[in-house]
């Protein structure tokens, strides 16, 4: 994306909607400018960063302060016209230079602490997700050079109060907000507009000659395809939560093979016939797991443990401990069955495959060998 693509509005029903940027972008920009201020020993009032999606942001700096080898800076969160609980709050970074050559990243006041497994971060760590961790560390490294070290603390004085308006406590993230964002940009869109933009990408892929498509919920799926399957990500299209819609669009466009790739936290819902996977539509993850574990003869003790879990990742640990990892192949086959049932009136339905992977990019299960699927995708 170019810089202009951030400034360009998103149109919905004749109304121009303004884009925003994530808490991850705020933390990255704050850390970068704080590091630069320590090095230069003067205040800086504007900073630019390149987001993971390639968009350049030029952001105003608030509350800049330098004291010796330490500097503090803040960026105000702007969600554009997609206002959430963090909109308008200040995200601060405190950067202290040292001679260690290493960059350490911690969360301070107002940043949540991970107290449960299942969110992809270690217990006890700050709720700063993987992509923002990478962008913060990269921005600071770019600023200070290869030899110096730095201690980076991200904090948000309003964080604990704001977090009460989020789902963090339900996820076991306590005491503050999460620093999140895989693209760095907040795009305000109605559901229909968002679906249409995803479908447009499918149309572009089909027009380029592709006949096989990989549908993923988001960026993690694309990374898995690239790193673990060795398949050209040109075949990957994001489906977000709109599984049924995107499958129907792929059929309409004449794709001969659809491969669903994702973490069980999303794809397991399809096994229950849920084709819109946003939590406000339906959840049933634990109920689906319990039902299919029971079909495979799992003991009542395991069924009870899984039923009591709040996250799929937590349930997966119990499943592994009881030796029921084969459920993922079973679920993948069930997902494909549900898709084919949905397409039962289609004249020439495509081949459907499903692959489930873990947060650390390991294959959990598939409806048939992944090597076979990958080989077909490379044809």
UniProtKB/Swiss-Prot annotation:
GO molecular function (one): cobalt-precorrin-5B C1-methyltransferase activity
Catalytic activity: Co-precorrin-5B + S-adenosyl-L-methionine = Co-precorrin-6A + S-adenosyl-L-homocysteine
Gene Ontology biological-process annotations: anaerobic cobalamin biosynthetic process; methylation
Keywords, comma-separated and alphabetical: Cobalamin biosynthesis, Methyltransferase, S-adenosyl-L-methionine, Transferase
Major enzyme class: transferase
Superkingdom as given in the UniProt entry: Bacteria
EC number: 2.1.1.195
Gene3D superfamilies: CbiD-like
Pfam families, alphabetized: CbiD
Pathway: Cofactor biosynthesis; adenosylcobalamin biosynthesis; cob(II)yrinate a,c-diamide from sirohydrochlorin (anaerobic route): step 6/10
Transmembrane residue ranges: none
InterPro entries referenced in this protein's UniProt entry, alphabetically: CbiD (IPR002748), CbiD_sf (IPR036074)
Record family assignment: Belongs to the CbiD family.
Matching PANTHER family: COBALT-PRECORRIN-5B C(1)-METHYLTRANSFERASE
NCBIfam families (UniProt xref): cbiD (TIGR00312)
Name of the protein in its database record: Cobalt-precorrin-5B C(1)-methyltransferase
